[in-house]
């Protein structure tokens, strides 16, 4: 492992020197390094990188759509907070969480709503959605944001093409495993979902999974996600207050320690959101460089990979470290 890390860092230093010698005429050196790293993912990898102060950027598979998985919770949060900015919603507004609101997958609310009676504020739900990627909180907030169409329309209003939100997580996961029809409200039970997930795959579920990775719904290109992160950081997507709130919550994200943050220098501040479903593994966020060198938005996606989660995470970690070091060494 140490030898692998050394060789990776040595290669990174080499591209920094090359970039410096070309007086920053484009970021071809960084793009070549991202291309070199891509096979580590074991599948199709997409990366969007933007140095936020200078606008310098580099991409790998820039305009290829990737399933967002839970990274789509960032655009959902943007539309939700836009409604707060417009006075249509209040962060203190309480939302009752009922048993039939349960959505399977990641999160903590499933353990709290086996009996009715729980109510949380929109701000509480926002933090749970982003900090621990809670799917029940996500679906409740997507409803308050007006649904996927409203989120997608908001992205287009910001000038972002290539990012769309279509389904609540309940339906997204159901499509991934080939569960049809989606259970009605009376049938939404955590134990029942656990039984479905633990059952052996069938021909139908395998076919559903294969189709899932090419489904245009709930997908984003690396260019589009990087653009959203850039607008969020520049306070162009939301009011300064809402922008600060969202970025603060993303800095406290509790998932994905081995992804964007995986091999960055200790103490590097990262505001990010992860996403994982099947053969898809993602992490998108903003890195703070040391010594006043600025900030870097990184949107990293992997799809159609049969490698272990650890190995896919390593590919994203290498891409993030490469972007971090590149701009650290080449920013004047």
What are the roles of these predicted feature ranges?
Residues 56-57, 112-114, 207-210, 300-302:
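A short small-residue
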């Amino acid at each position: 492992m140490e030898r692998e890390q050394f060789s990776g860092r040595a290669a990174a230093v080499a591209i920094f020197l090359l970039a410096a010698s070309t007086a920053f005429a484009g970021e071809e050196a960084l793009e070549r390094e991202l291309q070199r790293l891509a096979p580590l993912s074991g599948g199709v990898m997409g990366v969007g990188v933007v140095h936020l102060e200078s606008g310098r950027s580099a991409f790998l598979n820039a305009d290829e759509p990737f399933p967002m998985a839970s990274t789509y919770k960032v655009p959902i949060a943007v539309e939700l907070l836009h409604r707060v900015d417009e006075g249509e919603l209040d962060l203190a507004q309480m939302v009752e969480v009922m048993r039939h609101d349960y959505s399977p997958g990641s999160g903590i609310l499933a353990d709290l709503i086996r009996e009715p009676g729980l109510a949380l504020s929109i701000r509480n739900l926002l933090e749970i959605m982003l900090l621990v990627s809670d799917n029940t909180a996500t679906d409740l907030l997507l409803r308050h944001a007006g649904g996927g169409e409203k989120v997608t329309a908001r992205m287009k209003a910001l000038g972002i093409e290539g990012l769309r939100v279509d389904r609540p997580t309940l339906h997204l996961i159901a499509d991934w495993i080939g569960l049809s029809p989606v259970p009605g409200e009376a049938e939404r039970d955590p134990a029942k979902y656990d039984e479905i997930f633990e059952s052996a795959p069938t021909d139908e579920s395998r076919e559903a999974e294969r189709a899932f990775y090419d489904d245009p719904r709930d997908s984003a290109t690396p260019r589009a996600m990087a653009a959203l992160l850039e607008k969020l950081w520049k306070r162009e997507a939301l009011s300064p207050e809402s922008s600060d709130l969202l970025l603060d919550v993303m800095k406290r994200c509790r998932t994905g320690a081995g992804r964007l943050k995986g091999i960055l220098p200790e103490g590097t501040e990262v505001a990010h959101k992860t996403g994982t479903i099947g053969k898809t593994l993602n992490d998108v966020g903003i890195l703070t460089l040391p010594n006043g060198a600025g900030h870097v938005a990184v949107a990293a996606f992997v799809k159609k990979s049969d490698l272990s989660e650890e190995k896919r995470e390593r590919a994203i970690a290498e891409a993030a470290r490469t972007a971090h070091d590149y701009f650290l060494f080449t920013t004047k």
